[in-house]
Each structure stands twice: as structure tokens, then as C-alpha cells.
Amino acid sequence: MELILSTSPAELTLDPACQPKLPLDSTCQPEMTFNPGPTELTLDPEHQPEETPAPSLAELTLEPVHRRPELLDACADLINDQWPRSRTSRLHSLGQSSDAFPLCLMLLSPHPTLEAAPVVVGHARLSRVLNQPQSLLVETVVVARALRGRGFGRRLMEGLEVFARARGFRKLHLTTHDQVHFYTHLGYQLGEPVQGLVFTSRRLPATLLNAFPTAPSPRPPRKAPNLTAQAAPRGPKGPPLPPPPPLPECLTISPPVPSGPPSKSLLETQYQNVRGRPIFWMEKDI
């Protein structure tokens, strides 16, 4: 039985006997051509669309966010992409940046279009350290996801060192939970916790002071109890009492004193953040 599917204008048949013979001569192979139609496909590299080149490390600059208010939104988006947070809260935090610290720095790349504003590719925040006038605490370090692993993080940290050293600071502190080896390659070592100063002024705002409970009023000192042993009433004389037995010796075993400073491991830490996640405190002299 012959089954023929007729299509117009060409005829399509599935009968093997009616199939055309294909010659095996290589010189008689059918010729395949691409007929350009409404949409033309070409593999010519000269006609391919140009990809946006990655920014050059040499062209990066570091600028405070409060000096470029037009980039505030872009900086907030960059940080929220790593640590999601209310946009209003993030903008408020960035708006606190000032030359008196805390200070937010942006790593900027020139836009491919010369007339456009630069692109925010990184961010870090610097805060003063309590009781350490020559130290700064580095926080909220982030680089755009598409540019990670290409040297932008190192460029950002090196720029922070230059920025801090030019203003008289000699040590940087930071915390991390998964980038210990990255900071170790930059010269950081494990350190002790420090407290960053949130306010730019040494005096706390009055609104904050009013939030604390007032100190209790002083109470008159209590009279110390008289511990002087009073003489017992004398009774009839008798034989003297025997002396009391000696007190037993206190058997305490003190722990051995370590011969040197406690060893610190890059894999273990005793510190945790507010969420209970282990963190490493690191520091570097600059």
C-alpha cells in the first residue's frame, strides 16, 4: 500500500521505492546556501554587537558618598544586592556619611558614555575606634557581583589604606566570616574585637541620653555591723579549755600556665555576631 502525502506545490512521499537516490560522489554533493531574508544571520566578527568592556583597574577612583549625592541610590542598590534591607533605612545610613566619620567610600568606574555618571562598583564604610585614635574600623565591604574575582576587591582595600594613611591613621580593623584567606593575602592578621564609634561627636546626643534611665539617688551609708567579740560573762573558774584543732589545708590545683601567647587558627574563632554566626576579627598596620 502506498501512502502519499501530497503538499502543494511540492510532493512529499514516504514510499521507499519512490525516494530519490542521493549520489555518493563528493563532487555532486548538494550545495547549501543561506539566503538572506528579512533577518540575516552572519558570522562575520566585524558585524557582531560589541560587548560592554570590563572597567580597567587603573581607571577606578575612590570617593566619599556624601560628595556624590547623585550616586546615593546606585550605592544603596549595590549594598542591598548583597545584604537586603529596607531602601529607606539604607539611604538613611548612607546619608550619615561625613568627613568627621563614619564615612562611606564608593569605588567608581568611568561610564562607557563620557557624558554619563560613573558606575558604582564597590563600597566600604570607615568608623573611628573607641580609645584608639589612630585606628579605623572597616565595615560593609562589597563589590559588584559581576566583577568579583577580578581584582576589584583588592583595589578597594588598597584604596582604603591610602585614604586612611593620608589622614593620619595607622591601623585598620575588620570582621569577616568567609574571607579570612583573602584578607590574609592583603596582610591582615587575626586580632581582638574593637568598638566602632557611631557618632561623629564625642558627646552623645541629648535624645539618646534621655533614653537611658536616670541614675538612682544616693542612699545614706549603712552602719557596718559591730563584729567585735563581746566578753562573755565570767563564771566560776575552772580548768582551761583545750585549743581548737587546726583548719584543714585547702587542696587546690592551679591550671598550668601557658608558656607563650595562645595560638590563633584561621579555621576556628571564639567570636560571634549578633546572629550567632562565627566571625573573625582581623587587623593590619598601615
UniProtKB/Swiss-Prot annotation:
It catalyses: N-terminal L-aspartyl-L-aspartyl-L-aspartyl-[protein] + acetyl-CoA = N-terminal N-acetyl-L-aspartyl-L-aspartyl-L-aspartyl-[protein] + CoA + H(+); N-terminal L-glutamyl-L-glutamyl-L-glutamyl-[protein] + acetyl-CoA = N-terminal N-acetyl-L-glutamyl-L-glutamyl-L-glutamyl-[protein] + CoA + H(+). Keywords: Acyltransferase, Cytoplasm, Deafness, Disease variant, Transferase, Tumor suppressor. SUPFAM superfamilies: Acyl-CoA N-acyltransferases (Nat). Residues 33-54, 212-269 are annotated as: Disordered. Changing residue 207 to S: In non-small cell lung cancer cell lines. It is found in: Cytoplasm, Cytosol. Residues 236-248 have a biased composition (Pro residues). Substrate binds at residues 85, 90-93. The keyword Glycoprotein does not apply. Residues 60-207 form the N-acetyltransferase domain. Strongly expressed in heart and skeletal muscle, followed by brain and pancreas, with weak expression in kidney, liver, and lung and no expression in placenta. N-alpha-acetyltransferase that specifically mediates the acetylation of the acidic amino terminus of processed forms of beta- and gamma-actin (ACTB and ACTG, respectively). N-terminal acetylation of processed beta- and gamma-actin regulates actin filament depolymerization and elongation. In vivo, preferentially displays N-terminal acetyltransferase activity towards acid N-terminal sequences starting with Asp-Asp-Asp and Glu-Glu-Glu. In vitro, shows high activity towards Met-Asp-Glu-Leu and Met-Asp-Asp-Asp. May act as a tumor suppressor. This is N-alpha-acetyltransferase 80. It comes from Homo sapiens.
